[in-house]
């Protein structure tokens, strides 16, 4: 059947004759130069029901899809089940994390077992079958490299469960009746349902990974399915196991990914999944990823034009703990004058938490030079941030040696700390599962089951309660809020990794920091906790909201995709209205986040940077992800030089530590470091700044912040108060200073006794 107005019956007969003449051409069809220019003008609508008449295009096939579908309802179970080369072990439905063995992330889906070579090479569809087993990367359903327009299905329940939602690891929102549900779900539960991927070029398909529906309330997954391929979306060839259709074993629960590799690779443009059975109490719903190698096509200008390449000579692979340590050592040997490797503590399993320092004087704090840090891997399965930081360290070293003026200036004027893996225990667990089979949560938590991202003390509540009682800043400061004693006790549920980070941040006077996370494309800034306790989402700004907005935008706007209005959402949230940025509390509330703790307990302004929709992309995607984030990573580091900086000294020129720097109109102060130097992040404008310290007279200045990069110098010299001078003189001569309140009380007592 052809579309009305698209072809005459005579032309259709000619095409049919050409197709039948190609049967048995022994693969010559793949060399047909007309293939590359053919238009799929006769393609049926994507959501139409497959017609049995299509089988007339494939007379050599023993049974077409339509015939098989007519027989299937009479059988209680599929007659044959394929033995998967990489089947995940069976687990209970409540199993939280899958541990598929031997799935190293830098060898994604590479190891295979032998299987029978499929028969039936004589067919009308131009499909090539390979004898040699080959491993191929994912096509990119999870990373969104495959667009929504390339996904099609027979039927859908509703738009929110359309084919475009059938992506591996896609997450549903809390409200599952909106446009953002967690799978493709067929409109009917029968054997004629399918979901299809158009690769838009010849591709060597090698495997399929499936999941059930992501849902808090429903249990839906496919337990077995067939795989079909086509070059024109009309004539389909089912993957065979000998002489019969191969039935692949699907999922046994809804979250653990299951891999099935094809017995032999199939070369085609389209691939279709046809569910054969599903969970008894559920519906036909699935998420998936396709493994395939696009074939070179010199005639296709579109693909050549859109290929992402990088010129940076970096180590684009996933590194386990040992390899990460070795890479750090190599970088240190390449750039010994600007790098230093150290550790901030140990994980629960005893793995050292290594960091790389980059500075022209590594190992020491230079007066007047700001400190910056990047952290990644708080969630062990969010691997992209870890690899981006390892790439960043290599890049900075190479560019410094090449005397790149921008990088040289950054290194000489900034002390940079890079902590690529805060949760190495979790990462090793995710690394063992691999990039595609780890699911959404394998390795997220520490070894003792703690989520580091919300394991810091909740200082927000302490501050807000004090503000409600009007005790700020008289009794409770608006900054440097002390950690509660219960949190410091050994019995507190605090991860070893969390304690290590807190000690690290208290030791080094960080000014700006970014913690890299995954699963979204957005930059989140504090506060992360809502102020209204009965709400789960509420815009909760800090006193420095305008500064945080700029810092977030500086990263998002220089990222290749974050502010692209044409890109689709990763899962459920559309952050384009805020230009790729979001206030953490207005997104979802988190108590005890690193961002809030850093802002309220230290001088550091911390933001969460979500660098990709795919938490654990295949290593073949790392060059593209590096290109997406490279400029952003550098620009964000440069923001540490925005605002004002200076020294607070006494009349003898000695730096005053812990002096308070206040900015009029901003209810959040910072303090000077041990040498009396300070850095205050501010947007361009004129500010009234006050420096004060115990025992000194406060000093106020007008400080101007310009638009050019580089902090404005604003120094203060404080003189001691009269009482401080008296105390100093009396201590010098060995006498105790007079306590005026005590003396007044003594005089009053004497007067009472005299009257009595």
Curated annotation (Swiss-Prot):
<dbReference type="InterPro" id="IPR008969">
    <property type="entry name" value="CarboxyPept-like_regulatory"/>
</dbReference>
<feature type="glycosylation site" description="N-linked (GlcNAc...) asparagine">
    <location>
        <position position="241"/>
    </location>
</feature>
<keyword id="KW-1015">Disulfide bond</keyword>
<keyword id="KW-0732">Signal</keyword>
<protein>
    <recommendedName>
        <fullName>Inactive carboxypeptidase-like protein X2</fullName>
    </recommendedName>
</protein>
<keyword id="KW-0964">Secreted</keyword>
<feature type="signal peptide">
    <location>
        <begin position="1"/>
        <end position="25"/>
    </location>
</feature>
<keyword id="KW-0325">Glycoprotein</keyword>
<feature type="glycosylation site" description="N-linked (GlcNAc...) asparagine">
    <location>
        <position position="491"/>
    </location>
</feature>
<dbReference type="GO" id="GO:0008270">
    <property type="term" value="F:zinc ion binding"/>
</dbReference>
<feature type="glycosylation site" description="N-linked (GlcNAc...) asparagine">
    <location>
        <position position="337"/>
    </location>
</feature>
<dbReference type="GO" id="GO:0006508">
    <property type="term" value="P:proteolysis"/>
</dbReference>
<dbReference type="GO" id="GO:0004181">
    <property type="term" value="F:metallocarboxypeptidase activity"/>
</dbReference>
<feature type="glycosylation site" description="N-linked (GlcNAc...) asparagine">
    <location>
        <position position="281"/>
    </location>
</feature>
<dbReference type="GO" id="GO:0005576">
    <property type="term" value="C:extracellular region"/>
</dbReference>
<feature type="region of interest" description="Disordered">
    <location>
        <begin position="51"/>
        <end position="131"/>
    </location>
</feature>
<feature type="compositionally biased region" description="Basic and acidic residues">
    <location>
        <begin position="68"/>
        <end position="78"/>
    </location>
</feature>
<feature type="compositionally biased region" description="Basic and acidic residues">
    <location>
        <begin position="113"/>
        <end position="131"/>
    </location>
</feature>
<dbReference type="Pfam" id="PF00754">
    <property type="entry name" value="F5_F8_type_C"/>
</dbReference>
<dbReference type="InterPro" id="IPR050753">
    <property type="entry name" value="Peptidase_M14_domain"/>
</dbReference>
<comment type="similarity">
    <text>Belongs to the peptidase M14 family.</text>
</comment>
<feature type="disulfide bond">
    <location>
        <begin position="136"/>
        <end position="293"/>
    </location>
</feature>
<comment type="function">
    <text>May be involved in cell-cell interactions.</text>
</comment>
<feature type="compositionally biased region" description="Basic residues">
    <location>
        <begin position="79"/>
        <end position="90"/>
    </location>
</feature>
<feature type="glycosylation site" description="N-linked (GlcNAc...) asparagine">
    <location>
        <position position="231"/>
    </location>
</feature>
<dbReference type="InterPro" id="IPR000834">
    <property type="entry name" value="Peptidase_M14"/>
</dbReference>
<feature type="domain" description="F5/8 type C">
    <location>
        <begin position="134"/>
        <end position="293"/>
    </location>
</feature>
<dbReference type="Pfam" id="PF00246">
    <property type="entry name" value="Peptidase_M14"/>
</dbReference>
<feature type="domain" description="Peptidase M14">
    <location>
        <begin position="317"/>
        <end position="640"/>
    </location>
</feature>
<dbReference type="InterPro" id="IPR000421">
    <property type="entry name" value="FA58C"/>
</dbReference>
<dbReference type="Pfam" id="PF13620">
    <property type="entry name" value="CarboxypepD_reg"/>
</dbReference>
<dbReference type="InterPro" id="IPR008979">
    <property type="entry name" value="Galactose-bd-like_sf"/>
</dbReference>
